[in-house]
Amino acid sequence: MEEPEEQPPHEADTEPVVTSGASEAVPRVLPGDPQNLSDVDAFNLLLEMKLKRRRERPNLPHTVTELVAEDGSRVYVVGTAHFSDDSKRDVVKTIREVQPDVVVVELCQYRVSMLKMDERTLLREAKEISLEKLQQAIRQNGVASGLMQMLLLKVSAHITEQLGVAPGGEFREAFKEASRVPFCKFHLGDRPIPVTFKRAIAALSLWQKVKLAWGLCFLSDPISKDDVERCKQKDLLEQMMAEMVGEFPDLHRTIVSERDVYLTYMLRQAARRLELPRASDAEPRKCVPSVVVGVVGMGHVPGIEKNWTTDLNIQEIMTVPPPSASGRVSRLAVKAAALGLLGYGLYWTGRRAVSLLLALPAARHCLQRLSDAWPQK
């Protein structure tokens, strides 16, 4: 029986503004003393300022894809390369042009800490793969998934070391820009890491796990900034994904395709009509379409476009399948091998230590005295 994973909150604890705004219907500015404005009038005044900044026909980067919801809400998806300076500029320009009501980023609550770190601290953290990080990954995801997460972190550390650029700069820029937009909310739109890694590990055979781990362990190819910027081209990304599908199709499904569905669902949830405040209950309710900016890796953009108008059921991709019989056997074999290696290592170390100890003159002298003192039969 599959056990459903608990779904964490999707809205960041560090939300810039907790009040939602609107995207149309510029209200009239009311005259009078600002100190005597009601809450509704103050809201309308700030909303008008926001809408004046919002461009009707925004000049957007070529990495932005525009999607329209059934109710007229608009979603601007910024496709990014996670180590790219150009992507950071694309995110800033898009948010300033459209003045969104919601910003959704490709992060979950387990990675939200990167929004609070400065560039230097994050660069140092990204380069370090410590025992503490390994223990934390294993506690969160289990042994196999935790080890796989550390291998992927090793890949990220390799890129960080090659480029000297910390990952996730576009998300930090999105967070800062969202805090400058009136009534803009900040949402975490990615599936929780533990769910993704557990489903990925469950989808791979033992041989595929070994093959993938081997490839990640010995990754050492040099990477240039030009390589990262070329990742913003859809044709190159599709070629890379096609190669990945051929070798690890189940891994591509769990890490890319399923997250495409999840990100699409979260963007659609954010793109809902917004209700304007009323001066009194007697006034009729008025709702307007919203404007949303999504910040995701370029590799997810085709999947989001594909899933935008389809019916989505994220419960199917939020469950972790139970381990198979072969999976349980392989885990026991790995644990037995690890214990065997540990036992042999302790035996060899102890034997070597005893040999070195007995080779000392003082130890030989003590043994000789004990032998002389022992009663002979």
UniProtKB/Swiss-Prot annotation:
Residue ranges of region Disordered?
Answer: 1-34
Q: Keywords in alphabetical order, please.
A: Acetylation, Phosphoprotein
Q: Which Pfam families match?
A: TraB_PrgY_gumN
In this UniProt entry, the residues modified to Phosphothreonine are: 65
Where is the PTM N-acetylmethionine found along the chain?
1
Tell me the superkingdom of the source.
Eukaryota
Q: What is this protein called?
A: TraB domain-containing protein
List the InterPro entries hit by this protein, alphabetically: TraB/PrgY/GumN_fam (IPR002816), TraB_PrgY-like (IPR046345)
